[in-house]
Amino acid sequence: MFARPIRAAARYAVLIIGIAAVSTLAAQSSSAGWNPQEILKAEGFVKPPADVEKLIVTPRTDISFTSPSPDRSWFLRAAGMDRGDILAYGKPHIYLGGVQVDTAANRARSVTTSTKSALTLINPLTGATKPLEVPKGASVTGQSWSPNGTQVAYIASFANASYAYVADVATGKSVQVSKSPLLATLVTSIEFTADGKSLIVVLVPEGRGAPPTHGTGGIEDGPTVRLTNSRAVPQPVHASLLLDPHEKAQLKYYTTGQLALLDLKTKLVKKIGEPRMIRAVDASSDAAYFRVTQMTEPFSYLVPASSFGSVQELWNANGTVITKLATTALREGAVDDGDAPAGFGRGGAQPATDTSKRNINWNPVGPGLVYVQSVFASNGSGAAAPAGRGGRGGAGGRAGAAPARAQATSVRYLSWLPPFGAADTQVIYEGGPALGTIAYSADGKTMFVADSGSVFAIRTAEPTKRFNLGRGVTLAAGSGGGRGGGGGGASAGGADTSAAGGALQTRRGANGQSFVVVGTDGKSVALTGTRTPGANWSTQAPRPWLDKLDFESGQRTRVFDSPADGYDEFVTPLNDNYSQFLYTHESPTTIPDVWLKDVTANTAKKITANVDVGPELTGAIVKRFQVSRPRDGNKMWVDVTLPKDWRPGTRLPGIIWFYPREYTTQAEYERSRFTVNINRFPEVPSARPASSTKIWVSQGYALIEPDIPIWGDSGRMNDNYTRDLRENLDAVLDAVVEAGYVDRDRMGIGGHSYGAFGTMNAISLVPYFKGAIAGDGMYNRSLTPFGFQSERRSFFQAQDTYLDMSPFFRADKIVTPILMYHAWEDQNAGTAPLSATRMMAALQGLGKNAALYMYPYEDHSVATYASDLDLWARWFAWFDLHVKNAPATKKPIP
């Protein structure tokens, strides 16, 4: 609890805590000058073999189309490096309850570390590009379109400040809107007002004074103090919790900003209200009112800032609070919440009848606000609660001691008009007790309502007339208000929406609101879905589709259908009639590209030119098969990737890379495979090494990626963890050896995060791996006493299981050379760097063969080129020494 986390970036080289004696056998060089032993000893950043470095640093082609202009004539794309710059990541920063702050620049660290430095417009009809000017030396984030599509606003971040800029689409030129620096700590984007004349921003307050200090000379003025007050507050192990009153003061200082409007014509700044700890801002269409969500005190030492309380208020243009819309209390947990895992509470008791205003949003097709409100028969008259009532406190959800909840008889959808008094409400629609999402067409003539398992289209001029859109049709949450995302349209994801279902397509309108796309005939909507193969996933791929539906007649027309031998996925329409739209096409041998489909002309044209950066990997040989373990016949799937020039009869050094998961039955495990897509192209991602594992085959290794299911009774699967882990790995190893892919005497094992945990467990249980790699893992489960991963029991409820699963307590049994890596600033719950340093201390004390590399400035996985390249260098050096060139196991003399 009192361990002080790394608070600022202050380490400038990779720290090697220990390298035990290694084999004197020299590893065969993967490239000229490659010396694994020197690589492992180096105390600065190093690089892998040249061909591996090329795979990592070669820029990937961005083919995304996610940010359309309101008329969809252009798409906006931010461009830059695929990985981060160590100089940006190393810039001084602090952690305050999980909020990462670049204190010199008054912004979130994520803004500072943005890799984007350019803005480009793409013509969706031709693929032609047009650059937008960005100031030299700036990174860009938070970009958004103006309502009429003639301008793009963005945050330009420099070394010590961020500013609002606007680019003109016609000329490509950018101008700085104001010299006032932005406070981009909690609010990291900027938006236009609905009339396009101003920007809504949060600024650094004028005259706010110097940052808080501990006291005279910055000297700590007392001990860190904690009192339980005999209150049970079980929590997962959070990173970077607030430590003391000084950090509370810092959090308040760096999150308190001034809401303002920046006039694009005059460049004048209009301040709105007093500075507050603003989390989010949403303006009415006329910018006369603002929904302002603020973080509230008290702060807590027990939970991160994301669990701190908040209040949402309605402000007028002068910053006067008109009314309080919603309040959320500090959420530290409640031990009597039976539904919360391991005592993770949900905010205390709730009233038996909730008649508060919920889902408050700006009316997308009219003035004022809209909200929903439940009606209960127990109210006597059945009338809704008074319109002026504010939102309830607490975090929502049930509590164990809550009174029995009455069943709502109906749910009303109401408008709330200025000046937002108690009598300024009007019922728009009244539905059943299961009334869900409500959305509109852009012209406001049609309302779409999800109610009691169906979606209805309702003419606003004839609210009693409803058209049922059919079985299985869905309307995504969030479609009915609030400022949407990029506007590419909702998708059905991996759900099986094969027959008469589908997800209604939405897009972002000129006012920033999300609307259901309705054709120019006023009655046609688009639905997307995916036919999933279910149990046939290993031979058939998911097949996305797009239908047009005449909701008055019920007639459906298939517009787009993915072929069986490829994977085509709808991206976005270019008009409301869906006569032109973009989609991606790929196959196991065809890299993804975006195509323009013209339905009227029945033509398709490729408009992007994606590049395969690693044909030696994308052309690798992949074998997929099932393995049965002898004890009970339970089966698991295994993928083996072999170099493209591999020939049968050649046994390679092998690497098992895995991530265990828990299941109650074989059938449940099999269902988890249903989302596998056999028609995907095997691209080489630019992301962290742990997700780019196919790079192993570039150096002559066989990569084995098995599922490692842990089976058991619900809530008790981990009681079988070590048994299943050992038996599953035995079965996998036997299978890949018997298939002739690998040499049993040259096998390594590795994993990241929970896979690292599994790896350390594996080498503490079995002796036959020649080398191992474990990164960002937790190796002592007594350090996560109130649950981890899918384990919901506490250490005190399942002590034997926690201890049995902790490889730290079997460190003396480890004989496999183990390379650990960990990020110094790992913010993932339950994988503190302490885990790696303590495990290393144990291995050092026991004289085991181990190495530890601690990466500065990095989080739960490396994000910079420097760390990425360094990791691959150390990985290859370790396995080249211990696995690829491992001496043959001596067979006993008969």
Segments (PLM) and residue ranges:
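Alpha-helical and His/Cys-centered functional microenvironments
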Residues: I16-I19, T864
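N-terminal hydrophobic alpha-helix used for membrane targeting or insertion
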Residues: I17, A305, L846-N849
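Serine-hydrolase catalytic core recognition
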Residues: A287-A288, E297, G348, R358, ...
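Beta-propeller folds
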Residues: R7, Y12, I19, L25-T603, ...
